[in-house]
C-alpha cells in the first residue's frame, strides 16, 4: 500500500470511529425530555381527603354468624395492592374494636400482632373477605391506606353482633 493510500485509509478510519462516538443508539431519551418509563413521583399530600369506603354488607346493627363476610365499596379512590403507591389509590383495612387512624398515621401491620389488636389488611385490593369472630358485639371500621399503610380518606363504621 502506498503512503498516500495508507494515510487516506487511516484518516477515514479515524473519522468513522470519531463519528460513531457522536451517534447514539436511539435508546436513551434526550436529556431535557422526561423518560416515560419512570413513574411520576408520589406525594402522599395529593391523596384525596374525600376517598370513601362504605360497608355494603353486613348492615349496621346486623346479627350474623362467623365467619363474617364483609363487602365494601369505595368512591373517589381506586384499589391497588399494598406496596404500590399511586395518588388516588390504596388498599383497605378492617378495624375490629379498634379506633380509626388519623390522616397521615401509619396503620400497623400486616402481622399477627396487628390482627391480635383487631387490624386486618386487605392487601390484594379486594373488596370482600371474611373474618372468624367469636360470639359477641363488635364495632367494625373500614379505612383506606396507601401502599405504605398511611391512612387517608374517610372511614365507615358499623356495629354487628356475632351469634353461635
Predicted regions and their residues:
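Conserved aromatic beta-strand anchor motif in extracellular beta-sandwich/beta-rich domains
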Residues: 94-96
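Terminal disorder- and signal-encoded targeting elements
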Residues: 1-89, 98-164
Amino acid at each position: 500500500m502506498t503512503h498516500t493510500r495508507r494515510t487516506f485509509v487511516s484518516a477515514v478510519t479515524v473519522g468513522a470511529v470519531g463519528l460513531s462516538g457522536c451517534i447514539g443508539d436511539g435508546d436513551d431519551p434526550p436529556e431535557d425530555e422526561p423518560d416515560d418509563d419512570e413513574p411520576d413521583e408520589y406525594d402522599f399530600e395529593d391523596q384525596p381527603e374525600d376517598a370513601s369506603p362504605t360497608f355494603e354488607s353486613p348492615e349496621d346493627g346486623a346479627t350474623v354468624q362467623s365467619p363474617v363476610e364483609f363487602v365494601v365499596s369505595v368512591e373517589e379512590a381506586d384499589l391497588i395492592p399494598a406496596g404500590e403507591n399511586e395518588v388516588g389509590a390504596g388498599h383497605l383495612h378492617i378495624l375490629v374494636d379498634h379506633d380509626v387512624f388519623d390522616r397521615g398515621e401509619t396503620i400497623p401491620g400486616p402481622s399477627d400482632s396487628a390482627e391480635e389488636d383487631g387490624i386486618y389488611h386487605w392487601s390484594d385490593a379486594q373488596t370482600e373477605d371474611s373474618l372468624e369472630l367469636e360470639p359477641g358485639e363488635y364495632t367494625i371500621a373500614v379505612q383506606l391506606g396507601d401502599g405504605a399503610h398511611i391512612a387517608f380518606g374517610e372511614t365507615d363504621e358499623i356495629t354487628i353482633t356475632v351469634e353461635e
